[in-house]
């Protein structure tokens, strides 16, 4: 009987004029559906990793070792999750006293500054005044110090709003690093410089950089053999762990037949897992990672219903039902695909409840309210499109700030985490602190800049780009330039709100930093990597989830 109803619904859908969009199907097929690995092999790897960790811990405690370089290598190689307390203690020691006064070398001074700032320690950028000449410009002699330039370039991305010396440092280093890449392709640092110019460390996904840096580190004649072995083994072990996790999520997607039930929606389960892997990769966050991946998958379907398939009358019914969040509302929904969606959404959140302890359920309730809020925003945008209404930039942003999805993702990222997330955490989040608003605005602007060409080709609500053009009477090029300036400013506000003492524990803030990095990755290249899966995203997924590092 249900199949007859569905068939009837599908027939009526063909008659209804829908704003359909043809998204390409999943490029992965069933590649990640099954996971096979030798458990004995994993045990052997884990035992060797534990041995190497103890060796490295002794090196960290050694006072005669180059501690800055060691910390930097641990982070770049993707190993810092094993040494969080040791690194924390070392950096606090390095932040006090006269350590910075000993750094007359540009590379070391910049490294000291970057490592401390990215751990929330408020060190002054005045340390770089010593590298300026009498006229207030960076010394010309620095141009030949390539490693120093690269280190200063990376440090400059930890700047605050109005920190002019770091703005000058960024302009100075960018100019000369580009020249080095163009004119000295055989320079030993050429590859690292190109990568940094493409995406600086502050904006880079940790696991992707670890994969890249392991290959660079191995070629360094002075590399630490223990660190290199540990980095390779740890990367491959985590890859196995992530592949197993992904297979569970893909099976969940397949068993619920999402692609079949919602053929108009993007089928991007693998890409979504990769996205959330950028938020947290550590094994201890497995539960949180799986839950967040499922929620972003449901949100993607919701987005496509509102943005690419549903009629305004259908969306109005669905919006009202979602605000009530009551299975009894399902009977009032038509056509059949809305009933299916509603049932799937409510049942999925019931599944999530079962995965949580009773005392954790308040976190899911908070996240559920954010889901309701994003649905209201989706409907408001659909109403604008239906009425042909062109909002002002400010009016658009009040709605699209929510529809960006990042407030929902931040809230949901905390649901599966441990006791570090408390009622106070969610109270802090509800006040929309600067780090949250900056991250959300950044993702909104980068999404709109990256997806605008595709959206202009179909009947779609106007983005912040078009609304900015209208309100300020400027060209598209000028609007994009201005929004990119705002993106850069958002990073500075994020840096400012990351400084200790913070209102919430650092693991809470790191989720926001990492979510911001995922937005940068998905939209920076002037396109929407999620909707249109290209070579960059495909290669990145292969690097993290298919190809192990040769030992």
UniProtKB/Swiss-Prot annotation:
Keywords: Lyase, Magnesium, Metal-binding
InterPro entries xrefs: Isoprenoid_synthase_dom_sf, Terpene_cyclase-like_1_C, Terpene_cyclase_plant_C1, Terpene_synth_N, Terpene_synth_N_sf, Terpene_synthase-like, Terpene_synthase_metal-bd, Terpenoid_cyclase/PrenylTrfase
Binding site for Mg(2+) 1: 303, 307
Top-level taxon of origin: Eukaryota
Catalytic reactions of this protein: (2E,6E)-farnesyl diphosphate = delta-selinene + diphosphate; (2E)-geranyl diphosphate = beta-myrcene + diphosphate; (2E)-geranyl diphosphate = (4S)-limonene + diphosphate; (2E,6E)-farnesyl diphosphate + H2O = selina-6-en-4-ol + diphosphate
Short motif DDXXD motif, span: 303-307
EC number: 4.2.3.-, 4.2.3.16, 4.2.3.15
Disulfide-linked positions: none
Chain positions recorded as (2E,6E)-farnesyl diphosphate binding sites: 266, 303, 307, 444, 447
Pathways per UniProt: Secondary metabolite biosynthesis; terpenoid biosynthesis
This protein's record includes keyword Membrane: no
Keyword Magnesium found: yes
GO-annotated molecular function: magnesium ion binding; terpene synthase activity
Cofactors: Mg(2+); Mn(2+)
Binding site for Mg(2+) 3: 447, 451, 455
BP-aspect Gene Ontology terms: diterpenoid biosynthetic process
Residues that hold Mg(2+) 2 according to the record: 303, 307
Similarity comment text for this entry: Belongs to the terpene synthase family. Tpsb subfamily.
UniProt comment concerning the protein's domains: The Asp-Asp-Xaa-Xaa-Asp/Glu (DDXXD/E) motif is important for the catalytic activity, presumably through binding to Mg(2+).
Function: Involved in sesquiterpene olefins biosynthesis, constituants of cannabinoids and terpenoids-rich resins. Catalyzes mainly the conversion of (2E)-farnesyl diphosphate to delta-selinene, and also produces minor products such as selina-6-en-4-ol. Can also use (2E)-geranyl diphosphate as substrate with low efficiency, producing minor amounts of myrcene and limonene.
Official protein name in the record: Delta-selinene synthase TPS7FN
Source organism (scientific name): Cannabis sativa (Hemp)
């Amino acid at each position: 009987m249900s199949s007859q109803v569905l068939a009837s619904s599908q027939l009526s859908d063909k008659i209804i004029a829908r704003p359909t969009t043809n998204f390409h199907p999943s490029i992965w097929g069933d590649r990640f559906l099954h996971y096979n690995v030798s458990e004995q092999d994993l045990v052997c790897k884990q035992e060797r990793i534990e041995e190497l960790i103890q060796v490295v811990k002794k090196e960290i405690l050694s006072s005669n070792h180059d501690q800055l370089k060691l910390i930097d290598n641990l982070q770049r190689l993707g190993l810092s999750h094993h040494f969080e307390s040791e690194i924390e203690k070392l950096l606090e020691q390095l932040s006090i006293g006269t350590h910075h006064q000993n750094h007359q070398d540009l590379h070391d001074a910049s490294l000291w500054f970057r490592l401390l700032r990215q751990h929330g320690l408020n060190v002054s950028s005045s340390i770089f005044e010593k590298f300026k000449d009498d006229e207030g410009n960076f010394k010309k002699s620095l141009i030949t110090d390539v490693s120093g330039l690269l280190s200063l370039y990376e440090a400059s991305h930890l700047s605050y709003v109005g920190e002019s010396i770091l703005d000058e440092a960024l302009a100075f280093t960018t100019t000369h690093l580009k020249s080095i890449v163009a004119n000295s392709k055989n320079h030993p640092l050429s590859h690292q410089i190109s990568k940094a110019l493409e995406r600086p460390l502050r904006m880079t996904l940790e696991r992707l950089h670890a994969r890249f840096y392991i290959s660079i580190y191995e070629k360094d004649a002075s590399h630490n053999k223990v660190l290199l072995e540990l980095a390779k083994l740890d990367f491959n072990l985590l890859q196995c762990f992530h592949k197993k996790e992904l297979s569970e999520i893909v099976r969940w997607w397949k068993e619920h037949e999402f692609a079949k039930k919602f053929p108009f929606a993007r089928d991007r389960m693998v890409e979504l897992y990769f996205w959330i892997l950028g938020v947290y990769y550590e094994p201890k966050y497995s539960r949180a990672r799986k839950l967040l991946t499922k929620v972003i998958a449901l949100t993607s379907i919701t987005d496509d219903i509102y943005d690419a398939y549903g009629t305004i009358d259908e969306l109005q019914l669905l919006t009202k039902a979602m605000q009530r969040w009551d299975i009894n509302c399902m009977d009032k929904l038509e056509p059949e695909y809305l009933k299916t969606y509603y049932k799937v959404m409510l049942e999925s959140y019931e599944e999530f409840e079962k995965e949580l302890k009773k005392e954790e359920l308040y976190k899911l309730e908070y996240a559920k309210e954010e889901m309701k809020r994003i649905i209201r925003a989706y409907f408001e945008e659909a109403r604008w499109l239906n009425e042909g209404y062109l909002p002002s930039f400010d009016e658009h942003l009040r709605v699209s700030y929510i529809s960006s999805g990042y407030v929902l993702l931040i809230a949901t990222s905390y649901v599966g985490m441990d006791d570090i997330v408390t009622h106070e955490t969610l109270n802090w989040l509800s006040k929309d602190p600067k780090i949250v608003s900056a991250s959300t605005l950044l993702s909104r602007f980068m999404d709109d800049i990256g997806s605008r060409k595709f959206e202009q080709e179909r009947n779609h609500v106007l983005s912040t780009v078009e609304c900015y053009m209208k309100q300020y009477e400027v060209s598209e090029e000028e609007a994009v330039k201005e929004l990119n300036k705002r993106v850069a400013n958002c990073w500075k506000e994020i840096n400012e709100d990351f400084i200790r003492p913070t209102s919430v524990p650092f693991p809470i803030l790191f989720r926001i930093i990492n979510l911001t990095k995922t937005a940068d990755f998905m939209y920076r290249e002037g396109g929407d990597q999620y909707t249109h899966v290209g070579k960059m995203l495909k290669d990145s997924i292969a690097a993290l989830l298919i190809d192990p590092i040769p030992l």
